[in-house]
Amino acid sequence: MIGFSNDADILKYEPMLFGELHLPWQVLAAATDGTLSGTTFSAAGADFVIAQVLAGGVVYMRSGDGSLDGVYEIVSVDSATELTVSVIRSDSDDDPISPPASDDISYRISTFGPQASEAAFQLTEYFGIRPGNPASDIDVENVLDTQALRRASVFAVISSIYAMLAGKSKDENFWNKSLYYQRLFERARERCRFSVDAGSDGLADVTKSGASGKLVRD
């Protein structure tokens, strides 16, 4: 499964999508036995590895006394029962930021991984690289810098989620949000410019531009 963005990227724009607007059929793990100390979140009855929880994911946590109630970034999966979590960071290379310590935590880890995978496929199709274009001699692993694609992917994912929510509730606000993020996606895709290592030598051989969707030899 390919992907240019993750759930933590979406969290920066729309935290509500991991709260009351989460998709119940895309919950990876949920229970009521969580404990949080510093940046270490533990749940004795969990198996985060089998649940396929990944770094870059998002966990919603609420303590029994209500002192903790929010969504946080998953920095790493340290064992089957332990995660390193953080208040959302501006840069994934920054040190984790501790949420308020608490116990008796109800938690839920939901994902938009399937939507991110679909967005990535559509982007590779648009830019003419595999897997979107199976006939291409350039694979997604040959892309050297994916930051521009990440931004476009985030907007595409959020737009698709709000379209799905609008279809279920007929809420005009959801439709408006979907259209808003669709416009952001189209602009971000048009501005995309990234390098491709077509020769597998670690050097940029080709530049892709969203304005044309065509290859430009360097």
Set out the residue ranges of the language-model regions.
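Residue-level marker of positions within ordered structural domains that often coincide
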Residues: 79, 124, 162
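Short amphipathic alpha-helical segments and their helix-coil junctions
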Residues: 112-147
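Long alpha-helical scaffolds
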Residues: 33-34, 119, 159, 185
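Short, surface-exposed, charged amphipathic helix/loop patches that serve as local interaction elements
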Residues: 140-148, 152, 161-165
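Alpha-helix boundary/N-cap detector
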Residues: 107-114, 118, 148, 152, ...
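Surface-exposed interaction regions enriched in Ser/Thr/Asp/Glu
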Residues: 54-55, 90-117, 121, 125
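Autoprocessing Asn-cyclization modules and mimics
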Residues: 4-94
